[in-house]
């Protein structure tokens, strides 16, 4: 299942995502992974959370990003949750191909029983209808 924290840039999506990670660490039985566009939040995350700076992996388009996520999932059978901060940037995704990418990520998450929680810099009204039930928070 995918879950989305949406809102315009600067509305506090990252804080909500980090708070969610902090709570999840206390209850998690498996692995947690946090993907971001930098290492900026390294010291805000528990050492039980794997921080991945996506800019270090030469991802140049959304198809490569989906493959990257597939690789993460395939290498950790205990993976519970993947957190994606600044989703549009780290996934190299635009509004034009957003639906395709979200559907692929949703299919992956359901097939391998991994929750994917992401922050998306878009208003709730801009998001596609098929994700309306996947919105965790709208700012």
How would you name each of these model-derived features?
Residues 1-71, 127-130:
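Conserved P-loop
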